[in-house]
A protein has these predicted regions:
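Active-site beta->alpha loop and helix N-cap motifs at the rims of alpha/beta catalytic domains
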Residues: 2, 7-146
Length: 146
């Protein structure tokens, strides 16, 4: 049995309280490409407009990240991929990744993180350094979470 059961459950006859509905309004979820592959349709389990963060773990190819972003966006959700500074080799790599996200999935938001690795794989070790490249402004990103 998986950690999370993504199968749609039959609805109960008991309605959620207004307080609970208010609390849950605007929530977000996080997926990884390999978990997203096991979800037949996000539309069956998520309300329209949910923000979906896509976790970028070390070793996950950018192509898998972009494919997941494209799929989630096509299903009608706001996509916010993780950009872990310490696994991005250099500014050219960052620009390439941003171009792929924008060109293939129309992404204009991102979560900037230092990342889970201790030793940087390249020029960046913090999310601030990603911001300092100026690429997010140049490329028209509308929302960044740091």
């Amino acid at each position: 049995m998986g950690l999370l059961n993504f199968k749609k459950k039959p609805s109960t006859t008991e309605a959620a309280s207004p307080e609970l509905e208010s609390f849950l309004k605007g929530y977000s979820i996080e997926v990884m490409p390999r978990t997203a592959e096991r979800v037949p349709s996000f539309q069956e389990i998520l309300p329209k407009g949910t923000r979906v963060y896509i976790a970028h773990l070390e070793g996950t190819p950018i192509e898998d990240m972009v494919n997941t972003a494209r799929r989630v966006a096509r299903e009608g959700y706001t996509v916010m991929p993780h950009l872990p500074a310490r696994i991005i080799k250099d500014q050219a790599t960052l620009k390439d990744w941003l171009n792929q996200y924008q060109g293939e999935a129309n992404v204009d938001q991102a979560l900037l993180l230092a990342g889970g690795v201790v030793t940087p794989h390249g020029d960046f070790e913090s999310s601030l350094q990603l911001l300092e490249t100026g690429l997010f402004d140049q490329m028209g990103f509308k929302r960044l979470h740091v």
